[in-house]
Amino acid sequence: MFSAGAESLLHQAREIQDEELRRFCSRVTKLLQEAPGPATVDALQRLFLIVSATKYPRRLEKMCVDLLQTTLCLPASPEQLQVLCAAILREMSPFNDLALSCDHTPNTRQLSLVASVLLAQGDRKGEIRCVSQRIFKILENRQPEGPSVRPLLPILSKVIGLAPGILMEDQTNLLSKRLVDWLRYASIQQGLPYSGGFFSTPRTRQPGPITEVDGAVASDFFTVLSTGQHFTEDQWVNMQAFSMLRKWLLHSGPEDPCSPDADDKSELEGSTLSVLSAASTASRLLPPRERLREVAFEYCQRLLEQSNRRALRKGDSDLQKACLVEAVSVLDVLCRQDPSFLYRTLSCLKALHRRLGEDPGSERALVPLAQFFLNHGEAAAMDAEAVYGQLLRGLPSERFHSPTLAFEVIHFCTHNLALFDSHFLSLLRLSFPSLFKFLAWNSPPLTAEFVVLLPALVDAGTAVEMLHALLDLPCLTAALDLQLRSTQTPSERLLWDISLRVPSCLEAFQDPQFQGLFRHLLRTKASGSTERLTPLHQVLKPMASCARVTQCAEAVPVLLQAFFSAVTQTADGALINQLALLLLERSDSLYPVPQYEARVHGVLSSQLLVLCKLKPSLVVELSRELLEFVGSVSSIHSRASVFTCVVWAIGEYLSVTWDKRCTAEQINKFFEALEALLFEVTQSRPLADLPCCPPEVVTALMTTLTKLASRSQDLIPRVSLFLSKMRTLAQNPATSSVHSEEGAESIRTRASELLTLLKMPSVAQFVFTPPAGVCQPRYHRDTNVALPLALRTVSRLVEKEAGLLPG
């Protein structure tokens, strides 16, 4: 989120027109030809804002672009101007008028700026190879007074990411050697301050030793967690080298366990020889890549030891936690490339896991720790269930409000789906209530991740409980909000906190009467049971309009679609029946978030039809429940879309064609119930406090009644009479006060169409209950047997015999 002032500046930058931009470029061109000053800096800052504020590239005058390149390459140009020029040129890339070259740049700082612009071109003219060759030429210089490599390491990391295959074998070995030097042999004395001042004495300028985060004097080599007032150049390079270490190991390591660089150590995994090899004292004689792995392992072990110290400053404590995550990730890479590191790593990681449970704030390290045990747990013969349980259950319940943790945990699950065995998948499925807490609190950024994850979470044992949980997701968001606020003191809550204005929500959260429902809603694992949360829906109604709850509600329809797409792939008949009943039950039991009910009803109604298509016999098997559902007028007014689909499904699938158990008695029961309902919503006077019945429901009821009558032909005169009345009623001007003109016309048209078909009962039965062969493409491609042709022929015959039946 930007401040109002920043938003205003961005808006102005986006709205600037080409003519105004041309005039501004002329001013920038003039300033770049003069001596640099504050006006030049200000103009370049404004130009950078203009070119970076829009998604499409801005076109600048050629002279302006040429001067930007000239200023960037001039050794005498102030550093601030060079940085701004490089930033503007990067935003404009790629473009054809680039005249930069990294071959003649006088210093590494300027080379890093020029190289950043060249890499932004996208390797159109071999820029990446040119940049990498120039950097490696500098790396070959081992003179202490040589140019500083610190500005080049970010560029080198970018080169590795853009084109990892561009480096030659000798370049790979050279960089591995340099990384060994930078990581292992940085100075352990603090650097000198930039200026000691006129009155400083030699004693005050003498550098002191590097210290640990707890203030103790460092007794081992320098790392990124070493502290001091000032750092030397090689110490800064040490920090940057660690930041690119994992990327370089992944690039330079063996492509597979059988490659020569691995020395076939995968075959020795678990053997005494592997352990002896790992403990070898001749590591300095190893090839460059293996030597780098040894040094990287030592560096990470040192970081794990340093992270166990109690930091004196909060900034150092935060850095400890970040380095812990990276160190475990690097160790994972090392053990994958060389299994001889595995047994030296396990003991320290087991100790780390015990410590993570005691050290609040270090939970992020659980994700790489779980990844490590997932990759190596079987080889190490270690049961990592405690790590997985803490990651999938404890962490979401305690840290659901951390967006970073939420993304990392869910990304871990989606990224490793192919690696999960049946035991882990079972643990994952049982943990879905905890994972849903991340989703409920961070629904906009995590919705796409959960769409990928849901198929792995759904099985026959969790499907019903999970569907309840998805429908109650906005309610879970409100409950998590209250859980978080209940741990705060009144003075810690913000003035806009809704719980201050509606204290009943917090009181209900602490009320023993609702504790059981809240415990069920906030459970950490699947319980195998369901609870009706209607009392909570009413109690938490004041929070239904909260922004976070509304955002969560908007994600539910997408998640429901993903859920049904997954569950319908494997659901058996019993589960389909359960899901169909659940849809009917929950369609009138949703948390009252604005527009939530309508969106969810749209998904539920469409998915009910999918379930019926998968198992048409469910209409007969659930006839009692469906009769109860369609027997109430309230179902029409509260859930019209679901009701319409239920009525359609009855007309489509209540037939001997789909289920031999279907009887005439069942057809008559449904006919009488729907006939009475249609009479009630059309013939009786509508109540003032109830909306009128939608025309879509009326036409669906008429169609279903006609379908049922075509299957029990003694009902045809009865439905024909009713349809005649409906047609007359729709033509009555008084109907316009109940339905719109379009709605009344649709009712009249449908009644006329149905009456026409009923005049020839055998044809009506063929149309409304076609044999299975009609679904074959032949009926739609062959003009001699096409169904539309048959209907047109019947229509002409009926028109000639209009007096055959009353109507």
Swiss-Prot record:
GO biological process, one term: Golgi organization
Chief subcellular location: cytoplasm
GO cellular component: AP-5 adaptor complex; cytoplasm; late endosome; lysosome; nuclear speck; nucleus
Location(s) in or outside the cell: Cytoplasm; Nucleus
Keywords, in A-Z order: Cytoplasm, DNA damage, DNA repair, Nucleus, Protein transport, Transport
Pfam families on file: SPG48 (PF14764), TPR_AP5Z1 (PF25153), TPR_AP5Z1_C (PF25154)
UniProt key word DNA damage: yes
Signal sequence segment: none
Protein role: As part of AP-5, a probable fifth adaptor protein complex it may be involved in endosomal transport.
Subunit structure: Probably part of the adaptor protein complex 5 (AP-5) a tetramer composed of AP5B1, AP5M1, AP5S1 and AP5Z1. Interacts with ZFYVE26 and SPG11.
Name this polypeptide is given: AP-5 complex subunit zeta-1
Organism: Mus musculus
